Amino acid sequence: MVTRLVRERIPQRFGINALTDIQVLTPMHRSEVGTEELNRVLQAELQPHLATAEAEGRLLRSRGRRFVVGDKVMQVRNDYDRDVWNGDVGFVTAIDTEEGLMVVRYDDEREVLYDEDALEQLELAYAVSVHKSQGSEYKAVVVPLTLQHYPLLRRNLLYTAVTRGKQLVVLVGDPRALRRAVRESGDLTRYTRLALRLRAILPS
């Protein structure tokens, strides 16, 4: 469902670019709808040349991940030498497999060169954790919620996720998970009408 929303339904209905304008946000890294699995699936769906690039040796690998030209990636630690920072998102524009080099273009049009050792600073960013999304905004946000996320289903996490979307927010998954997230406030109280609005559309 998440892949179809990102690849087809949202772009077709709202004219939003799947690669540059839609961000999947998920509470966890490991699960069927965690960042690791969603990035694997979304990369395969949104980069149709992935299999060919792998067969022809036109990709780079780092920590079990495959990078190809066009990939959406996130810097996951501060790198003062390259002037890139934890949470910066960009797109792979060039790969040199013989030299083990990759170029990433960031939002401000800067192009940053990574060698094979520096690739460990990058992760695929088709899906990112809600925590990593703090401080960012996206045209459209897709948030999968399941009971696999049970320990993390809190109102403040849901609030962070849905307030990242500027134009469109899509919640997809188990209504029971959404009900729990609305109900569980944890230690943080926010005075917004989000919980009331979500309760109004949830089946009782």
Name these PLM-found stretches:
Residues M1-R82, T93, I201:
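Conserved helicase motor core of P-loop NTPases
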Residues M74-N78, N86-S204:
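C-terminal accessory regions
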